[in-house]
Amino acid sequence: MALERTFSIIKPDAVERNLIGEIYHRIEKAGLRIIAAKMVHLNDEQASGFYAEHEGKEFFPALKEFMTSGPIMVQVLEGENAIARYRELMGKTNPEEAACGTIRADYALSMRHNSVHGSDSPASAAREIAFFFPESEICPR
């Protein structure tokens, strides 16, 4: 198994409902380590930059509006096969299709208000981590 890093967002809907601690508990219980974390409130320019791959798509304006609607928690997770393990812990994007016991099955309100985001590949993880964290803010443990 390979030690790798992934990127995670606790979205505005989950932050507003005070789910940060519960989600962190699940992350750590799954054997992943949080090696960087901070709370940010994205502005329109930051949201556009982070979600640039979706620019021009029908859902892009609503996605930006949601992701700038309140603070988010961004974090870097590390562990064996962290990307796949965190994606399994999150559950499917559509909470109605997410397996019981996953974060989205338990906390998501809808497809958009689905509580969390996680990188889907090593390339995405590297890009997303670098967007929010200089290497000096990451503390492997």
UniProtKB/Swiss-Prot annotation:
Gene Ontology biological process terms in this record: CTP biosynthetic process; GTP biosynthetic process; UTP biosynthetic process
Localization terms from the record: Cytoplasm
Entry-linked CDD domains: NDPk_I
Lineage: superkingdom: Bacteria
Pfam families: NDK
Top-tier EC class: transferase
Catalytic activity as recorded in UniProt: a 2'-deoxyribonucleoside 5'-diphosphate + ATP = a 2'-deoxyribonucleoside 5'-triphosphate + ADP; a ribonucleoside 5'-diphosphate + ATP = a ribonucleoside 5'-triphosphate + ADP
Keyword Cytoplasm: yes
Leader peptide range in chain numbering: none
Active site as annotated: H117
Cofactor(s) listed: Mg(2+)
An MF annotation (GO) of this entry: nucleoside diphosphate kinase activity
Description of how the protein assembles with itself and partners: Homotetramer.
Biological role stated in the UniProt entry: Major role in the synthesis of nucleoside triphosphates other than ATP. The ATP gamma phosphate is transferred to the NDP beta phosphate via a ping-pong mechanism, using a phosphorylated active-site intermediate.
Family of this protein: Belongs to the NDK family.
Record's protein name: Nucleoside diphosphate kinase
